[in-house]
Amino acid sequence: MKVVVIQGPNLNMLGIREQRLYGPMKLEQIHQNMKTFADQNGMEVEFFQSNLEGEIVDKIQECLGDADGIIINPAAYSHTSIAIRDAISAVSLPTLEVHITNIHAREEFRRHSLTAEVAAGVIAGFGPFGYHMAMIAMHQILSELGALKEAQAKAQAQAQEGAKES
Protein backbone atom coordinates (compact mmCIF):
# COMPACT_ATOMS: atom_id res chain seq x y z
CA MET A 1 0.00 0.00 0.00
CA LYS A 2 2.04 2.96 -1.30
CA VAL A 3 0.96 6.58 -0.94
CA VAL A 4 2.72 9.52 -2.56
CA VAL A 5 2.40 12.85 -0.74
CA ILE A 6 2.76 15.82 -3.07
CA GLN A 7 3.27 19.29 -1.61
CA GLY A 8 2.81 22.40 -3.73
CA PRO A 9 4.33 25.87 -3.79
CA ASN A 10 5.57 27.59 -0.64
CA LEU A 11 4.90 24.58 1.60
CA ASN A 12 8.67 24.26 1.97
CA MET A 13 8.36 27.53 3.93
CA LEU A 14 6.05 26.12 6.63
CA GLY A 15 7.19 27.13 10.10
CA ILE A 16 8.54 30.39 8.69
CA ARG A 17 5.78 31.72 6.46
CA GLU A 18 2.68 33.35 7.97
CA GLN A 19 2.68 31.42 11.23
CA ARG A 20 -0.60 33.01 12.28
CA LEU A 21 -2.25 31.08 9.41
CA TYR A 22 -0.11 27.98 9.03
CA GLY A 23 1.39 27.55 12.51
CA PRO A 24 4.97 26.87 13.57
CA MET A 25 5.29 23.26 12.36
CA LYS A 26 7.77 22.67 9.56
CA LEU A 27 7.04 20.46 6.57
CA GLU A 28 9.69 17.98 7.70
CA GLN A 29 7.82 17.41 10.98
CA ILE A 30 4.52 16.90 9.15
CA HIS A 31 6.24 14.34 6.94
CA GLN A 32 7.81 12.59 9.94
CA ASN A 33 4.39 12.30 11.59
CA MET A 34 2.95 10.85 8.37
CA LYS A 35 5.82 8.37 8.09
CA THR A 36 5.23 7.24 11.67
CA PHE A 37 1.57 6.57 10.85
CA ALA A 38 2.55 4.75 7.67
CA ASP A 39 5.07 2.55 9.48
CA GLN A 40 2.51 1.68 12.15
CA ASN A 41 -0.10 0.74 9.54
CA GLY A 42 1.89 -1.21 6.97
CA MET A 43 1.97 1.60 4.45
CA GLU A 44 4.80 2.94 2.32
CA VAL A 45 4.94 6.71 1.93
CA GLU A 46 6.97 8.89 -0.42
CA PHE A 47 7.23 12.68 -0.15
CA PHE A 48 7.65 15.26 -2.90
CA GLN A 49 7.54 19.07 -2.80
CA SER A 50 7.87 21.53 -5.65
CA ASN A 51 7.12 25.15 -6.33
CA LEU A 52 6.81 24.38 -10.06
CA GLU A 53 3.53 23.35 -11.65
CA GLY A 54 5.10 21.16 -14.33
CA GLU A 55 7.14 19.20 -11.78
CA ILE A 56 3.96 18.52 -9.80
CA VAL A 57 2.22 17.30 -12.96
CA ASP A 58 5.21 15.06 -13.73
CA LYS A 59 5.14 13.59 -10.21
CA ILE A 60 1.40 12.86 -10.41
CA GLN A 61 1.94 11.08 -13.73
CA GLU A 62 4.83 9.06 -12.25
CA CYS A 63 2.40 7.72 -9.63
CA LEU A 64 0.60 5.70 -12.29
CA GLY A 65 1.74 2.12 -11.83
CA ASP A 66 3.95 3.07 -8.87
CA ALA A 67 1.51 4.20 -6.17
CA ASP A 68 -1.86 3.14 -4.82
CA GLY A 69 -2.98 6.62 -3.79
CA ILE A 70 -2.04 10.30 -3.68
CA ILE A 71 -2.33 12.86 -0.92
CA ILE A 72 -1.82 16.32 -2.37
CA ASN A 73 -1.74 19.87 -1.10
CA PRO A 74 -1.60 21.80 -4.37
CA ALA A 75 -1.52 25.03 -2.33
CA ALA A 76 -2.11 28.07 -4.56
CA TYR A 77 -2.30 25.83 -7.64
CA SER A 78 -5.59 24.46 -6.26
CA HIS A 79 -7.31 27.57 -7.52
CA THR A 80 -5.58 27.95 -10.88
CA SER A 81 -4.09 24.76 -12.28
CA ILE A 82 -6.09 22.95 -14.89
CA ALA A 83 -2.90 20.99 -15.65
CA ILE A 84 -2.70 19.54 -12.13
CA ARG A 85 -6.44 18.87 -12.15
CA ASP A 86 -6.15 17.01 -15.45
CA ALA A 87 -3.13 15.01 -14.24
CA ILE A 88 -5.04 13.85 -11.15
CA SER A 89 -7.97 12.89 -13.33
CA ALA A 90 -5.74 11.07 -15.83
CA VAL A 91 -4.04 8.74 -13.34
CA SER A 92 -7.36 7.62 -11.81
CA LEU A 93 -5.82 6.93 -8.40
CA PRO A 94 -7.61 7.65 -5.11
CA THR A 95 -6.53 11.22 -4.36
CA LEU A 96 -7.13 13.25 -1.23
CA GLU A 97 -6.60 17.00 -1.20
CA VAL A 98 -5.35 18.63 2.00
CA HIS A 99 -5.25 22.28 3.00
CA ILE A 100 -3.83 23.46 6.31
CA THR A 101 -6.23 26.41 6.44
CA ASN A 102 -9.95 26.46 5.74
CA ILE A 103 -9.82 27.76 2.18
CA HIS A 104 -13.57 28.44 2.31
CA ALA A 105 -13.07 31.00 5.08
CA ARG A 106 -10.28 32.88 3.31
CA GLU A 107 -10.12 35.36 0.44
CA GLU A 108 -12.71 34.92 -2.30
CA PHE A 109 -10.12 33.80 -4.87
CA ARG A 110 -9.08 30.89 -2.59
CA ARG A 111 -12.58 29.53 -2.05
CA HIS A 112 -12.82 27.42 -5.20
CA SER A 113 -10.47 24.51 -5.82
CA LEU A 114 -10.21 23.18 -9.36
CA THR A 115 -8.29 20.16 -8.11
CA ALA A 116 -10.92 19.27 -5.50
CA GLU A 117 -13.33 18.49 -8.33
CA VAL A 118 -11.31 15.36 -9.18
CA ALA A 119 -10.26 14.36 -5.64
CA ALA A 120 -11.98 11.60 -3.68
CA GLY A 121 -12.15 14.00 -0.74
CA VAL A 122 -10.87 17.27 0.69
CA ILE A 123 -9.61 17.94 4.21
CA ALA A 124 -9.25 21.63 5.02
CA GLY A 125 -8.87 23.81 8.07
CA PHE A 126 -7.43 21.33 10.59
CA GLY A 127 -3.87 22.61 10.46
CA PRO A 128 -1.10 20.03 10.16
CA PHE A 129 -3.44 17.43 11.72
CA GLY A 130 -5.25 17.40 8.38
CA TYR A 131 -2.38 15.34 6.98
CA HIS A 132 -2.90 12.72 9.70
CA MET A 133 -6.60 12.68 8.87
CA ALA A 134 -5.70 12.16 5.21
CA MET A 135 -3.48 9.20 6.10
CA ILE A 136 -6.31 7.61 8.09
CA ALA A 137 -8.77 8.18 5.24
CA MET A 138 -6.34 6.90 2.59
CA HIS A 139 -5.63 3.77 4.63
CA GLN A 140 -9.37 3.12 4.82
CA ILE A 141 -9.93 3.77 1.10
CA LEU A 142 -7.05 1.52 0.04
CA SER A 143 -8.08 -1.23 2.47
CA GLU A 144 -11.62 -1.19 1.08
CA LEU A 145 -10.35 -1.25 -2.51
CA GLY A 146 -8.04 -4.14 -1.65
CA ALA A 147 -10.88 -6.11 -0.06
CA LEU A 148 -13.08 -5.44 -3.09
CA LYS A 149 -10.40 -6.65 -5.52
CA GLU A 150 -9.86 -9.74 -3.38
CA ALA A 151 -13.59 -10.52 -3.35
CA GLN A 152 -13.81 -10.02 -7.12
CA ALA A 153 -10.85 -12.33 -7.72
CA LYS A 154 -12.40 -14.97 -5.46
CA ALA A 155 -15.76 -14.72 -7.24
CA GLN A 156 -14.06 -14.97 -10.63
CA ALA A 157 -12.07 -18.03 -9.52
CA GLN A 158 -15.25 -19.67 -8.23
CA ALA A 159 -17.05 -18.90 -11.49
CA GLN A 160 -14.21 -20.44 -13.50
CA GLU A 161 -14.24 -23.52 -11.25
CA GLY A 162 -17.99 -23.81 -11.75
CA ALA A 163 -17.58 -23.54 -15.53
CA LYS A 164 -14.97 -26.32 -15.53
CA GLU A 165 -17.29 -28.63 -13.59
CA SER A 166 -20.13 -28.14 -16.09
Curated annotation (Swiss-Prot):
Q: Specify the domain of life of the species encoding this protein.
A: Bacteria
| Alphabetical keyword list | Amino-acid biosynthesis, Aromatic amino acid biosynthesis, Lyase
Active-site residue numbers: Y22 (proton acceptor), H99 (proton donor)
Q: Where is this site: Transition state stabilizer?
A: R17
User: Could you state a single Gene Ontology molecular function term?
Assistant: 3-dehydroquinate dehydratase activity
Q: Which PROSITE patterns match?
A: DEHYDROQUINASE_II
Gene3D superfamilies linked: Dehydroquinase, class II (3.40.50.9100)
Which residues form each disulfide bond in the chain?
none
Q: What is its EC number?
A: 4.2.1.10
Tell me the residue numbers annotated for binding substrate: N73, H79, D86, I100, T101, R110
Q: Name one GO biological process term.
A: aromatic amino acid family biosynthetic process
Instruction: Show the HAMAP family listed in the entry.
Output: AroQ
Quaternary context: Homododecamer.
Question: What functional role does this protein have?
Answer: Catalyzes a trans-dehydration via an enolate intermediate.
Q: What is this protein called?
A: 3-dehydroquinate dehydratase
Q: Which organism is it from?
A: Wolinella succinogenes (strain ATCC 29543 / DSM 1740 / CCUG 13145 / JCM 31913 / LMG 7466 / NCTC 11488 / FDC 602W)
Specify the taxonomic lineage. Bacteria, Pseudomonadati, Campylobacterota, Epsilonproteobacteria, Campylobacterales
Name the gene behind this protein. Answer: aroQ
